[in-house]
């Protein structure tokens, strides 16, 4: 992993030299510098344009904004890593919009920022009615040098015994566990057409089978129930 992620500049207006001006509208106060970038400030999560036009934008959190001796506006940022950039690469347990907050800090030109995004807590992410292209979520902090994650243990869930991610789930009607559609061989289209799903263990109850023999049901992601409160070592699942 390179120490920096070079970006490509885009045409942003920059004003320099004004003093003691408060944040007003699109203007951001940087000591004696006003940067008229219009859409980001310290603490925001932003998309940074990569040098390779074929790659998706990098995601970073703005830690500090300042101008150097030549009045070039610089952004101190903390990178988010996508699963593909971690030591173990992307695995089945990773959500499509999952990011890791790394300990990789960097300095980039303000010109490389092409827009804002939102990195939600996982709980808030699962409550979104509509997930936009700008929406991501983060559960783990990630040490770029060692590949270690914090926290290092997470709950696992029924059937696949994998950490929960944001992919499509359905609920088992009798025991109320949640399972990934892919783990039970059901597509999203099939799940929408059917009403209930009964797991193998619950189907041994004859009354249950008679009452709930019609198939599957789609499910929301609230009130998840771990698999017998099992926990797994994140190092085994995320780092290998």
From Swiss-Prot:
The record places domain BAH at 38-153
The protein's GO terms of the molecular function aspect are: chromatin binding; histone H3K4me3 reader activity; transcription cis-regulatory region binding; zinc ion binding
Q: Which Pfam families match?
A: BAH (PF01426)
An example GO BP is: negative regulation of gene expression, epigenetic
Principal location = nucleus
Q: Where are the zinc fingers (PHD-type)?
A: 155-205
| A GO term from the CC aspect | nucleus
**Subcellular location(s) per record:** Nucleus
**Does the record carry Zinc as a key word?**
yes
Keywords from the UniProt entry: Chromatin regulator, Metal-binding, Nucleus, Transcription, Transcription regulation, Zinc, Zinc-finger
Under PROSITE patterns, the record lists: BAH
**What family classification does the UniProt entry report for this protein?**
Belongs to the SHL1/EBS protein family.
Q: How does it assemble?
A: Recognizes di- and trimethylated histone H3 at lysine 4.
Checking PANTHER family in the record gives:
OS08G0421900 PROTEIN
What's the stated role of this polypeptide? Chromatin remodeling factor that binds to methylated histone (e.g. H3K4me2/3) to prevent their acetylation (e.g. H3K9K14Ac), likely by recruiting histone deacetylase (HDAC) complexes, and thus regulate the transcription of target genes.
Name of the molecule in the record: Chromatin remodeling protein At4g04260
Instruction: Please tell me the species this chain comes from.
Output: Arabidopsis thaliana (Mouse-ear cress)
